[in-house]
Amino acid sequence: MVTIEPLAFEQLNIGDKWTSADRTVATADLQSFADLTGDHDPLHTDSEFAASGPFGRPVAHGLLGLSLLAGLSSNAPAVLTAALVDIRGWSFSKPVFVGDIVRAVTEIIDLKPKGRRHGEVHWYRQLINQKGEKVQDGILITLVSRRVPLPNIKTLQSPTIGSEVANLEVIGQ
């Protein structure tokens, strides 16, 4: 297994772009997502019912596609994510079916410093199928941690305090 060092906010640039590994959507994914969310709509889980529906076969839950994209893009790139703060303009352009092979394409479209510890990253993300078709896309906004340098630490010895607490750390001096 390869260890990937996550990127910090200051290592990211507008225009940086990544493509994830591929993932095949399985029947078990639809069933597991239905069990997790409680959305057992037969359009997703019943082949016979779905055959008479608009797609002629079971279609993945829209939010399953978004969830797959979140997982696929978590290592493309690996970053020091602190929080997801917003999703904007999310579109479900085409259905995702069992057997589809999907990947995430990610591009940084904006960076905003947010204090000393984090920065806000605006990611344009697309879920692409095996035909090269965009099936979902939109903007996800996350807080990404900065690599804050360690403060200057000095160790003080105190002759009047017991040995259990004799070493004190002073930060920022």
Feature annotation, model-predicted:
Residues 1-13, 92, 96-101, 105-173:
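HotDog/MaoC-like acyl-thioester-processing domains
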